[in-house]
């Protein structure tokens, strides 16, 4: 399924693996995570290769809202409670450092990288926002609490993370992957601890990174028995309101909003596949209420 990101973008093409090779690190999976692993390994002078069963960055990466932020919901109070002070601080710092790394890379790529603030808002749960602010403060991060947003509806409040970013993910991926050692249309059929077999070749590696959307091999935990498919949606609304920032709802259906060119992107409506109740119609109603003209839609899947 096409998306706003896949239009008018020509991704680099890579050969199929048709021989037996050896390398220090094998990466399996060519989404954003796998491509970035390959990039940083190359920067560090490590011998590597990446195997992708189809084309790179055509899954979630090509159908995302494409926000770069350390805000992923009300997570830091929970992290503090479950991890303790030291680990929660490291978790927050790692997220913030990743945002800066993305921005630094984006400065050298034609990927519509834009620094902007990110807001986590709630229409009814002020107390939860206040608790999250307190947790962030105890972790050494000064986030702002505000009741003044650019949203076209009233909110109880919002937590602002300054200097986050948004971008065009496929432009970013196209630019960063051009000189990487990647093999496309090279699905891994069999695998051991240090070896991967494809239809036409094989890779022997000292280390293997599995960067697929879900673990495609049976590892400890038997995750293949526990996985189920979730679906969520992103609507691209032409000539929608300019929000001057990125927004994520802390409750209800996890509404996500950001602008790109003349579009307002509205994401959310997540639900378990196969369930009678889903939030697609609700998401469309919200989109019609906050945008001015026609809608375009695509669907994302997660497990």
Protein language model regions, located:
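N-terminal Rossmann-like FAD-binding beta1-loop-alpha1 element of flavoenzymes
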Residues: 25-49
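Dinucleotide-binding Rossmann-like beta1-alpha1 core, especially the glycine-rich loop
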Residues: 71-147
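Helix-loop-beta segment of a Rossmann-like dinucleotide-binding subdomain
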Residues: 110-120, 146-173, 269
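Extreme N-terminal leader/targeting segments of oxidoreductases
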Residues: 1-23
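Conserved small/polar residues in nucleotide/adenosyl-binding loops
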Residues: 293-300
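Helical element adjacent to the flavin cofactor pocket in flavoenzyme catalytic cores
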Residues: 159-194
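Flavin-dependent oxidoreductases
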Residues: 191-260
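Glycine-rich FAD pyrophosphate-binding loop
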Residues: 44-63
